[in-house]
Amino acid sequence: MIIVKSEREIELMRRAGKITAAARALAGEMVKPGVTTQEIDRAVEHFIRKQGAVPSFLHFPGPPGVRAFPGSVCASVNDEIIHGIPGPRVLQEGDIVSIDVGAYIGGYHGDCAATFPCGKVSPEAQNLIDVTRQSFFEGIKFAKEGCRLYDISAAIQGYAESHGCSIVREYVGHGIGTEMHESPEIPNYGHPGRGPRLLRGMT
């Protein structure tokens, strides 16, 4: 079930979102040759806690038989696709690094991600970053009342594929609120006009 939030709930979510966005920006500034993903993780955790929030990802439970997530950020380098565990890996010139950050405050979560170039990257890597970012904004255009859920998915897929990129189909976006992962699941591919109709207050 997709939870529709009140204006007050969305204001509380904004607080978490602003902390999360600032933490992601800090992480992005640290993506430089010679820095480890663990150093980024520790700096982000310190920043989030300084704001009075708690890192959403730290000790997030995994599926049965998988240990809880050990970091405050997901740091995925080059061909790693999401949920990369921060550690002693030293970033190199030309790497691209996806940073995913979450913060919890006042009963609500914030969650955001972005991919950053480490120093000078290849034209192909920069194109991937640029197309991915714009695909996100193409999807956002349809995240409004009256659209269908898969209008978002189709816009992302259409832009990415029309610019020579492909879609990762094994992972999806998700709703958020008092829980880190709420309904609905939002794939990055699909047919427009399908899925639930979006209502004001869905997050």
Per-region residue spans from a language model:
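Active-site neighborhoods and metal-handling regions in enzymes and metal-associated proteins
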Residues: 1-203
